[in-house]
Structure formats: C-alpha cells, structure tokens
Design a protein with these regions (language model features):
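N-terminal pre-catalytic "stem/leader" segment of glycosyltransferase-like enzymes
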Residues: 1-67, 218-228, 234-251, 262, ...
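Structural alpha-helical scaffold elements that stabilize or flank donor/cofactor-binding regions
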Residues: 55-57, 95-96, 181-182
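Catalytic core of nucleotide-activated saccharide and alditol-phosphate transferases
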Residues: 67-160, 300-301
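Conserved active-site histidine-acidic residue motif and adjacent donor-binding/catalytic loop
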Residues: 170-185, 196
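Short alpha-helical segment that forms part of, or immediately flanks, the ligand-binding pocket
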Residues: 180, 208-215, 229-230
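Acidic donor-binding loop of glycosyltransferase active sites
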Residues: 184-200, 218
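Nucleotide-sugar-dependent
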Residues: 193-207, 225, 229-230
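A short, well-ordered alpha-helix in the C-terminal region of glycosyltransferases
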Residues: 259-276
C-alpha cells in the first residue's frame, strides 16, 4: 500500500474540521504508513510539502487534500502526483479533475459530487465520533446547552434570551477541551447553522455536535441542513429547530426539558461513526484507491470533462420540457 500524506495548511488550528482530519490521520496510521504534512509555512518537527515532493516517488505515495479554498491550487501543485480530495463542505464552485478521487464526509456531500463529478471515483467516509462522547448516566444540572459559533441570529438573539428567563442555559463561546463532559450535564442541546452556511453559499460539511450531544444523552433541537440530514430524523431522534414561530419552539423545548428521560443503555446513536466502524470503511477505501492509481498509471484514456451545462443546470431543460409534455398530455385526454 502506498504511503499516505495528509496535507494541512498549518497544525495549530482550533476547528472541528481540523480535529476530524487529525482523527482520520490517526486511523489511517493503523492501516498504512501515513503522516501529516504542512504546506502553508514550515513548522518545527513537521514535514513541509516541497521537501516531501522532492524526496518521494510520484507513484508510491498518495496526497490527501481537504481545505476547501486551497483545493484548486493544491491540485495544480500536485499535477504529477496521486491526489485524493476529502470533501466536507460543498459549494466552492470548483471542478475536480477525473484523475482525483473524492472521499465524501457525508451522504449529502456524496450526492453533490455524484452529480457534479459523475465520472470520478467517489467514496463515502463519515467523520469519527470519539469514544468520550458517550452517556455517563449521571444527574444533569444544565437544562440547555448552545454553542455560539456558527449559530443563527434567531437562536442567539431571540430564542436563547426567551429561554434564559425560565431555564439554566449554558452558551459556549470559546473552544472547549471536554465538550463531552458538558453534554453529559445537559438535557437539551440547541444547534442552528443554516444561516451561517447560507451566507457563504457553502454547505454544512458534517455537523458533528448534534450527534455528539445525542451520544451523550441530550435531546437535540437542530436545523436539518445539508450533512445534518445524514443522521437527524425529526420526530424520531431529534426535533427541528426554528419551526413556525418562537412560541412553538419554546413550547417544544419546554416539553423536552420537563419530559426528559434517560436514553436506553443499549442504544448508541453514533455507532456508525465510531473508530472501529470508520476504520472498516477506510480499509476498503484505501485498497480501492491503491487499485485505482495502479490502473490510472497504465490507462490514460480517462473520460473527458462533462459538459458544465449538464452538470449544473439540469432544471433549465426540465422547464422547457414540462410545458410541452403537459400540452400534449391534455390534447390526448381531449382526443380520448
């Protein structure tokens, strides 16, 4: 199996995406030779991309890229290398060449790239939920937890103030080392990122906090945008937030707090996202990537880029087709 290099702009990043990538790197190291490489600027104790390119055989390594805004430049920079794009958020607007396989971090992203890169090799690999996110079955002294970062104005400026007059509400406004401990103290977790992602024209890449909260026993109220729809099922394992009116949300949240019950001991809502399950998928994917790059080296007859009109503007054709279809259908009814 080829050596694998996970590319990072830098290593000192406090974000969920960076943490998810680090967890995946650790998992890959159980399967194949894998290490982190930085490409922004040199950092002590870490390989730098330009040095790695000079020291490695082009065919005996795989470079995994993921930082959305840097992807087009990195693909050009690694033109003669085996490159894989690990895609979380979508909507950046770039095309991925058919020579670059795509690993989608959610089923929402999988569907996006299956439409916009129909000739590419595509896999699905969910982000990892750490074992620390589990229900400890302890008394809960916080009614509601909210993470300020990426939250909608409605959540922070209307809903939270209305709830604070009746319930104990913790608003997390900085990086937390032990988020699982907080989730294990809370009955309800509120999450609404639809406004945040919409303003940038991007999608929620994986949205792990609601699933982490569920794994710790919280009742979740959330937006269901993008990758959140992978695992959130309103009315069955969560409640949709920002529904109809402020008063409706308040009523639903109040009912959840007063009716909160300890979840089943046997059920783990994050079972498919645990390290063991993700590792099994990763083993299959890495084997498939190795085979793909072996074949690519021997077979230069790749599909030509798909017509952009076909990929990105299918609705225009439908609009032209529908009126004619119904006109002919009505004529046939009259004739009958």
């Amino acid at each position: 199996m080829r050596d694998i290099y996970f590319l990072f702009p830098q290593m000192n990043i406090e974000s969920g995406g960076h943490l998810a990538q680090m967890k995946l790197l650790e998992l890959a190291q159980r399967i194949a030779p894998a290490q982190a490489v930085v490409y922004g600027s040199r950092e002590e104790g870490l390989p730098f991309l330009e040095d790695v390119l000079q020291q490695t055989d082009a065919d005996k390594s795989i470079f995994i890229i993921h930082w959305g805004f840097h992807v087009p430049d990195l693909i050009d920079r690694l033109a003669d290398r085996n490159v894989v794009y690990l895609s979380y958020s979508t909507g950046y607007g770039f095309q991925i060449p058919v020579r670059v396989p795509i690993i989608a971090g959610s089923r929402h992203t999988l569907a996006y790239w299956s439409r916009h890169a129909p000739d590419s090799l595509i896999y699905y690999l969910p982000a990892i939920i750490s074992e620390e996110f589990m229900n400890l079955h302890r008394p809960r002294d916080i009614d509601i937890v909210v993470q300020k970062r990426k939250s909608s104005r409605y959540l922070l400026e209307e809903l939270v103030p209305a709830l604070q007059s009746q319930y104990s509400v913790m608003v997390i406004d900085s990086w937390v080392e032990d988020l699982a401990a907080i989730f294990n103290r809370a009955r309800v977790f509120l999450y609404d990122t639809s406004e945040y992602w919409a303003q940038y024209g991007l999608s929620e890449g994986f949205g792990l906090p609601p699933l982490e909260a569920m794994a710790c026993g919280c009742t979740v109220f959330s937006s269901i945008n993008d990758a959140l729809s992978d695992y959130l099922d309103p009315g069955f394992n969560c409640h949709k937030l920002h529904t109809y009116s402020l008063q409706y949300d308040l009523k639903q949240i109040s009912s959840a707090i007063h009716g909160w019950q300890e979840p089943s001991l046997e059920h783990d809502p994050a079972a498919d996202y645990r390290s063991e399950a993700v590792q099994r998928r990763l083993e299959v994917i890495l084997t498939g990537l190795d085979d793909f790059f072996d074949h690519q080296r021997l077979d230069p007859s790749a599909f030509q880029p798909v017509n952009k009109t076909f990929v990105s503007k299918p609705a225009s054709g439908i609009r032209r087709w529908i009126p004619g279809f119904f006109k002919n259908w009505i004529k046939s009814l009259r004739a009958g």
